[in-house]
Amino acid sequence: KAMHLSGITKNDANHISGPSRTGEGLYLAVSACLELAGIEGNDLDYISAHGTATLYNDEMESIAFDRLGLNNIPLNSFKAFVGHTLGASGVVETILGMKSMEQGRVAASLGCDVIGVSKKINVVQEVLEIKPQYFLKTGSGFGGCNGALIIESL
């Protein structure tokens, strides 16, 4: 069982289709989401990133997560398993993340052989056996939309 603890969206209005190179919108969304949830970044056990495996998105995410001090939190992306389902990706990946919480295991980021970003991130390379208490789902979209959602295990 799990409970939605907090969720928020921010828009950096950066570009019609490309994410902000600075990660500002995602940084603001996650910061506000953590504050709303009443927890600190180091309370997070797991991050399900938007993770498109594109240069601009992955770099932007690594910058935002670095600024937030989330470099060591286990992180994965489900897109290699289910594809980029566009508007449904946040919902689909939230469900998969909640299933991870329930089963006590976090899936590896399929096909991630090289971490090609400038900031340190802790990409899950093999199935990770943990019982997450808090999980962060992030998503970024066209027009500068950035969302963050924190789920708590009950």
Would you name each region that the model predicts?
Residues 14-22, 52-69, 87-92, 126:
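Short glycine/threonine-rich loop-to-helix capping motif typified by GTGT followed
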Residues 1-37, 45-46:
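Condensing-enzyme catalytic core mediating Claisen C-C bond formation in acyl metabolism
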Residues 1-3, 28-42, 63-81, 89-142, ...:
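Structural signature of cysteine-dependent C-C bond-forming condensing enzymes
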